[in-house]
Regions:
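Short loop/turn and low-complexity linker motifs enriched in small/turn-promoting residues
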Residues: 1-127
């Protein structure tokens, strides 16, 4: 078993945005749900064009709020994680290699921030 502890940094630009931490291959997820590219498009008013349903995100990942920390226990077969916004913008993919042993469990500490902002699309990013 593996455990990831994700801490999401507080950012004003994404204060009201939920992110989902999704275990598994980003490429496989994109292919399964027909996502092209990492970021969503915007309409003429600057609002994101949603390209994925919340039910899909809830079924495949765990929600994380601004400034929150979550812990997820994963199967040994999971080798990477990434994050997704409500609108379908995707983060970079983090590969889980050489975690610390804490109580006999391979543990990874991940810090998530937000890139983009007020004039461009906000999206999650693992540092």
């Amino acid at each position: 078993m593996k455990r990831i502890i994700v801490t999401r940094e507080k950012k004003i630009a994404s204060a009201l945005m939920l992110y989902w931490v999704i275990p598994g291959s980003k490429q496989a997820f994109m292919q399964q749900f027909g996502l092209v590219g990492d970021l969503t498009e915007h309409d003429a008013f600057g609002q994101p064009l949603y390209r994925i349903d919340i039910a899909v995100l809830d079924a495949n990942g765990a929600r994380i709020k601004n400034g929150e920390q979550i812990a997820l226990d994963l199967n040994d077969s999971v080798f990477s994680v990434f994050a997704c916004t409500r609108s379908g913008s995707l983060s970079n993919e983090v590969y889980l290699q050489s975690g610390q042993l804490v109580g006999g469990i391979e543990t990874y500490y991940l810090k998530m921030t937000t890139k983009g902002g007020f004039k461009t699309v906000s999206y999650p990013w693992f540092e």
